[in-house]
């Protein structure tokens, strides 16, 4: 039943997306300041900053060295020598990501600021920023883009996640905007804000998911949040199961803590259609999986449990989604890997059971994780518009 509901939702979202293709990006160049926090980002920082500085939509790029202990400061100095006044290098004692972003905001002079991460590839020769800026010009106070996956140099786990990540984010956040009035989150990897709005509310380090906390704060105060599905960026993913576990634990526990902090939102339109469905899907999924697995184990044994994890219609659906992702990333290996995306479903369910529900009542979060960075980013001169690998390229070069 849930698979058919998902198929109907997907068709509806596709039709809605096709209806928006006539919208044009803003052509107002040089009117956005980019702010990038950096803590021990030496391996990937230079290429990320170079791509941002080559983007004609940005007036200046502000990078805040948040007390790094590697060569981040030296990399920033080299970028400064190359780009001069268009690059603003700021160094401070470690305060956390929220504090670094707010310090960078002190140097912003444009009416709009774009926030991203040091490991994220932002295409310099596409109109993604233009589509976000167009939403601002239509009255939005903050706009979220789509964080996809950087596959160059990535291992097996990022490829598995990339099989469904982009289409699922587009579908979920579009549906949240239509029904709940705003997307669930403006990702820290791709968000644009009116500068005066961000200065008024700002980021807080009271949670480890400052982007989610800020999004919900803006919604609670009546600000207009929008989604720009044609602005796509490419952050690095975790290559090891341990780092992936820690990152998902931070996200899910942070989600639970934000529900605790924003109780007044829970039964609003946004809460009912954008916040609660994420949790209800988990609770429903856990119940269905446990019931199905138990029945299969009793009737057919362990192999029945394995077959229940990969029902034929579900495999077909995720392979279709994987085929789109494979075309988009120019990596056809994503099609056969698509059924393995169930690993991330089970990962999320397990973390919710172990940590998420407890965090809602205690408000306690783990320390912020720091995934291992790798230097294989796409450079501005790359022929393709997004990071890609071929089917014969090694999954990991890191």
Curated annotation (Swiss-Prot):
One of its GO terms (molecular function) is ligase activity. GO terms for biological process: DNA damage response. It is an enzyme of class 2 (transferase). Keywords: Glycosyltransferase, Ligase, Transferase. Transmembrane segments: none annotated. Its EC number is 2.4.-.-. InterPro entries: Glyco_trans_2-like (IPR001173), Nucleotide-diphossugar_trans (IPR029044). It comes from the Bacteria. The keyword Transferase applies. The keyword Ligase applies. Belongs to the glycosyltransferase 2 family. This is Uncharacterized glycosyltransferase YaiP.
């Amino acid at each position: 039943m849930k698979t058919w509901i998902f198929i109907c939702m997907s068709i509806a979202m596709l039709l809605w997306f096709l209806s928006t293709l006539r919208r044009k990006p803003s052509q107002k160049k040089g009117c956005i300041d980019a702010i990038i926090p950096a803590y021990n980002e030496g391996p990937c920082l230079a290429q990320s900053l170079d791509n941002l500085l080559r983007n004609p939509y940005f007036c200046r790029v502000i990078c805040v060295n948040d007390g790094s202990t590697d060569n981040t400061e030296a990399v920033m100095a080299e970028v400064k020598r190359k780009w001069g006044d268009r690059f603003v290098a700021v160094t401070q004692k470690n305060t956390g990501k929220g504090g670094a972003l707010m310090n960078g905001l002190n140097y912003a002079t444009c009416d709009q600021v774009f926030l991203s991460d040091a490991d994220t590839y932002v295409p310099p020769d596409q109109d993604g920023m233009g589509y976000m800026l167009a939403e601002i010009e239509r009255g939005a106070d903050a706009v979220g883009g789509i964080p996809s996956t950087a596959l160059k140099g990535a291992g097996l786990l990022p490829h598995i996640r990339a099989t469904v990540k982009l289409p699922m984010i587009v579908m979920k956040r579009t549906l949240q905007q239509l029904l709940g009035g705003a997307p669930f989150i403006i990702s820290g990897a791709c968000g644009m804000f009116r500068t005066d709005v961000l200065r008024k509310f700002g980021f807080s380090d009271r949670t480890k998911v400052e982007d989610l906390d800020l999004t919900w704060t803006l919604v609670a105060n009546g600000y207009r949040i929008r989604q720009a599905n044609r602005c796509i960026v490419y952050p690095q993913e975790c290559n090891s199961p341990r780092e992936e576990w820690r990152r998902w634990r931070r996200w899910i526990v942070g989600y639970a803590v934000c529900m605790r902090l924003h109780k007044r939102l829970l039964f609003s339109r946004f809460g009912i259609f954008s916040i609660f469905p994420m949790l209800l899907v988990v609770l429903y999924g856990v119940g269905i999986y446990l019931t199905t697995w138990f029945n299969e184990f009793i009737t057919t044994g362990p192999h029945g449990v394995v077959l229940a994890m990969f029902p034929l219609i579900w495999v077909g659906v995720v392979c279709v989604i994987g085929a789109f992702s494979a075309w988009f990333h120019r990596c056809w290996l994503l099609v056969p890997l698509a059924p393995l995306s169930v690993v991330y479903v089970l990962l999320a369910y397990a973390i919710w059971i172990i940590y998420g529900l407890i965090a809602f009542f205690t408000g306690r979060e783990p320390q912020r994780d720091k995934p291992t960075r790798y230097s294989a980013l796409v450079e501005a001169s790359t022929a393709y518009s997004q990071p890609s690998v071929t089917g014969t390229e090694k999954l990991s070069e890191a």
